[in-house]
């Protein structure tokens, strides 16, 4: 695992140095920063430590593979590393076990893998995990449901409340309907039972 480091008087200066020295873009890395107080003859400095997203995803994959082997399952992995969204796709000998009811096991695996990366590399990496494209298909269903519900709300002028969803799923709904003319959305409730309301403007 390659570790990149730089320092500067400000975060911006330290980060700019790191990107230039290593010929990388901000979208390729994740970094943490530490403020170091200067002494009598030294200025304050900001220390930047960074890792490549691709290598962090590979470490997360290793962690997940060991976890899945502990369940007596075999798995293959596919890493999609894009600047806007990073996904680790899993294809196992028993996908239903890894998916769980309503995708709860996928979510648990995701939390564990993210925590592993944070604990070992001190970066908050919000990558996602999918099993046999379950999440991709569910995302499409949620977007389709949101749009169908919005059309019904426009027609009847009666607000609609969707079932409770994760924060990621609620963001999908808000995003899908952000340009839907005459409709507005907001979320209510407390986790893990927070839900989205679709209503006319």
Give a label for each model feature.
Residues 1-201:
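RNA-contacting regions in translation and RNA-metabolism proteins
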């Amino acid at each position: 695992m390659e570790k990149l480091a730089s320092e500067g008087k400000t975060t911006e200066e330290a980060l700019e140095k790191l990107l230039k020295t290593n010929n990388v873009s901000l979208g390729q890395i994740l970094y943490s920063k530490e403020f170091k107080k200067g002494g009598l003859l030294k200025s304050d400095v900001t220390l930047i430590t960074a890792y490549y997203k691709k290598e962090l995803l590979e470490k997360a994959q290793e962690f997940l593979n060991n976890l899945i082997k502990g369940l007596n399952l075999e798995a293959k992995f596919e890493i999609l590393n894009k600047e806007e969204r990073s996904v680790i796709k899993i294809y196992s000998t028993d996908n239903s076990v890894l998916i769980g009811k309503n995708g709860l096991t996928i979510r648990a695996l995701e939390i564990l893998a993210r925590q592993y990366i944070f604990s070992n590399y001190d970066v908050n990496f919000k990558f996602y995990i999918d099993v046999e494209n379950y999440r991709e298909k569910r995302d499409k269903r949620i977007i389709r449901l949101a749009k169908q519900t919005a059309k019904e709300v426009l027609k009847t002028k009666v607000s609609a409340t969707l079932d409770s969803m994760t924060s990621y799923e609620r963001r999908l709904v808000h995003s899908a309907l952000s340009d839907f003319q005459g409709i507005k959305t907001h979320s209510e409730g407390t986790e893990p039972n927070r839900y989205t309301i679709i209503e006319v403007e």
